[in-house]
Amino acid sequence: MSLLLLQLLVLSCLGDTEPQPDSQQRKRRPLQHLFYLDRNLLESQSFHELVGENPVGVKETQEEPSFFIAFPQTAGESQKQGEKKMSRFILPNAELYAHQDLRTWAAPKEISPVENFSPSYYSNKRDVEPPYRKDAKKFWDHFMLRKNSASEEVVLPIKTNEMHQETCRTLPFSQSVAHESCEKVIVQNNLCFGKCSSFHVPGPDDRLYTFCSKCLPTKFSMKHLDLNCTSSVPVVKKVMIVEECNCETQKIEDPLLGSRQSDFLGNLPEHN
């Protein structure tokens, strides 16, 4: 409030004074400084009512916003150009108010809503893939396993990764076909190699049901080889040429294994 009264006093004194010679203007030069005014104070209604919209002798500059107000010089053009160099000078006693008002002028940076619709914003969203999509196939296989097991009224605690560890592939090799008193023949063939799953289910009446998935040839052809022999009897060999292999599930019912299990259970001691 004291700063406001001081500024009003200076404005009223400068508005009433008449132009004086150069010697008197030099005496008033210390009063012709730049005063730091708060923007909220300049725009307040009470300040305009006390001072007026446009005080006498004050020029409004709308070229660029500034925190400083310069009072006009009544001297010549040479002195005005010299004072323009000091138009950005801040009084030492006004620096205290400048530091106190920095917090009011420093506003947080607001993000425009247009930036949220930029392509880079959505590209980053698309790059971050939800983690559950990576295991979508595993969850689906687990669901199908429980669904198929429920139809048989049996829920098997089998992990899905154990079911997908089956490997069965063809490995090329050179197969030699030989016979007594005949020339050996080399044939390019494939063998089945891999690891397939299997499980064993005990059944009623000591019967055991074994479900084995074996790595077997699924695509093959039979080839007849005529061997060159010294005997008068022709020798023909029949060879399976394997092209593809896969895990094939087979159900085996072995009563011999059932009898072995009953013998094993009969030898166990009874526990009360």
UniProtKB/Swiss-Prot annotation:
<dbReference type="GO" id="GO:0001657">
    <property type="term" value="P:ureteric bud development"/>
</dbReference>
<feature type="disulfide bond">
    <location>
        <begin position="196"/>
        <end position="247"/>
    </location>
</feature>
<dbReference type="GO" id="GO:2000381">
    <property type="term" value="P:negative regulation of mesoderm development"/>
</dbReference>
<dbReference type="GO" id="GO:0036122">
    <property type="term" value="F:BMP binding"/>
</dbReference>
<dbReference type="GO" id="GO:0007399">
    <property type="term" value="P:nervous system development"/>
</dbReference>
<comment type="similarity">
    <text>Belongs to the DAN family.</text>
</comment>
<feature type="glycosylation site" description="N-linked (GlcNAc...) asparagine">
    <location>
        <position position="228"/>
    </location>
</feature>
<keyword id="KW-0964">Secreted</keyword>
<dbReference type="GO" id="GO:0009948">
    <property type="term" value="P:anterior/posterior axis specification"/>
</dbReference>
<dbReference type="GO" id="GO:0042074">
    <property type="term" value="P:cell migration involved in gastrulation"/>
</dbReference>
<keyword id="KW-0732">Signal</keyword>
<dbReference type="InterPro" id="IPR006207">
    <property type="entry name" value="Cys_knot_C"/>
</dbReference>
<feature type="domain" description="CTCK">
    <location>
        <begin position="168"/>
        <end position="253"/>
    </location>
</feature>
<keyword id="KW-0325">Glycoprotein</keyword>
<dbReference type="GO" id="GO:1901207">
    <property type="term" value="P:regulation of heart looping"/>
</dbReference>
<dbReference type="GO" id="GO:0030514">
    <property type="term" value="P:negative regulation of BMP signaling pathway"/>
</dbReference>
<dbReference type="GO" id="GO:0071276">
    <property type="term" value="P:cellular response to cadmium ion"/>
</dbReference>
<dbReference type="InterPro" id="IPR016860">
    <property type="entry name" value="Cerberus"/>
</dbReference>
<protein>
    <recommendedName>
        <fullName>Cerberus</fullName>
    </recommendedName>
</protein>
<feature type="disulfide bond">
    <location>
        <begin position="182"/>
        <end position="229"/>
    </location>
</feature>
<feature type="disulfide bond">
    <location>
        <begin position="168"/>
        <end position="215"/>
    </location>
</feature>
<dbReference type="GO" id="GO:1900108">
    <property type="term" value="P:negative regulation of nodal signaling pathway"/>
</dbReference>
<comment type="function">
    <text>Cytokine that acts as a regulator of the activity of Nodal/BMP pathways during the establishment of bilateral asymmetry in the head and trunk of the embryo.</text>
</comment>
<dbReference type="InterPro" id="IPR004133">
    <property type="entry name" value="DAN"/>
</dbReference>
<dbReference type="GO" id="GO:0010629">
    <property type="term" value="P:negative regulation of gene expression"/>
</dbReference>
<dbReference type="GO" id="GO:0005125">
    <property type="term" value="F:cytokine activity"/>
</dbReference>
<dbReference type="Pfam" id="PF03045">
    <property type="entry name" value="DAN"/>
</dbReference>
<dbReference type="GO" id="GO:0061371">
    <property type="term" value="P:determination of heart left/right asymmetry"/>
</dbReference>
<dbReference type="GO" id="GO:0003419">
    <property type="term" value="P:growth plate cartilage chondrocyte proliferation"/>
</dbReference>
<keyword id="KW-0202">Cytokine</keyword>
<feature type="signal peptide">
    <location>
        <begin position="1"/>
        <end position="19"/>
    </location>
</feature>
<dbReference type="GO" id="GO:0005615">
    <property type="term" value="C:extracellular space"/>
</dbReference>
<dbReference type="GO" id="GO:0008285">
    <property type="term" value="P:negative regulation of cell population proliferation"/>
</dbReference>
<dbReference type="GO" id="GO:0035582">
    <property type="term" value="P:sequestering of BMP in extracellular matrix"/>
</dbReference>
<dbReference type="GO" id="GO:0042803">
    <property type="term" value="F:protein homodimerization activity"/>
</dbReference>
<dbReference type="GO" id="GO:0023019">
    <property type="term" value="P:signal transduction involved in regulation of gene expression"/>
</dbReference>
<dbReference type="GO" id="GO:0048263">
    <property type="term" value="P:determination of dorsal identity"/>
</dbReference>
<dbReference type="GO" id="GO:0010628">
    <property type="term" value="P:positive regulation of gene expression"/>
</dbReference>
<feature type="disulfide bond">
    <location>
        <begin position="192"/>
        <end position="245"/>
    </location>
</feature>
<dbReference type="GO" id="GO:0001947">
    <property type="term" value="P:heart looping"/>
</dbReference>
<dbReference type="GO" id="GO:0003140">
    <property type="term" value="P:determination of left/right asymmetry in lateral mesoderm"/>
</dbReference>
<dbReference type="GO" id="GO:0030282">
    <property type="term" value="P:bone mineralization"/>
</dbReference>
